[in-house]
A protein has these predicted regions:
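Juxtamembrane/disordered regions of integral membrane proteins
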Residues: 1-143
């Protein structure tokens, strides 16, 4: 379990952190800045973003085991199916609902930014759990 957390968590963090940069800055950066206007920062606070992603990956890594144990016993779900559902749920709750909807409500963020960003983070959550599941399968031994 220790290797799963350390190696799986580190690799997942690196992939997801960099994918977030590619999506939010390289692919959609101009669109986000146009839509967000005055509420967008000129320079990102990367240490805060990295800390948030470290916590995010750690939470997913810890709770994937619990969620999979339950889903396997109750619904006979595979690890892959569990990872997709669990990851999408965490992605939506973590950033889509809690972050995105509150930002829309408090920062004059356009609703379309909430929709695009929340959709991305829901998919990102599923990908995070899928990557973790590969390491879980290898180091913990799930079928």
């Amino acid at each position: 379990m220790k290797k799963y957390f350390l190696i799986g968590g580190l690799v997942t963090f690196v992939v997801i952190f960099n994918l977030g940069y590619v999506f939010h800055d390289l692919v959609m950066g101009d669109w986000f800045h146009d839509k967000e206007g005055d509420i967008a920062r000129e320079e990102l606070v990367l240490p805060a973003i990295a800390l948030a992603f470290l916590i995010y990956v750690a939470i997913q890594a810890y709770f994937l085991h619990i969620f999979h144990t339950f889903a396997k016993a109750q619904y006979a779900w595979s690890l892959t199916r569990t990872a997709l559902v669990f990851g999408a749920l965490i992605g939506f709750l973590w950033d889509g609902l809690q972050g995105g909807l509150i930002e829309y409500a408090t920062l004059k963020m356009p609703f379309e930014v909430f929709l695009v960003d929340s959709s991305y983070h829901t998919a990102e959550g599923a990908l995070t759990a899928l990557i973790l599941s590969l390491f879980y399968r290898r180091y913990v031994g799930a079928p």
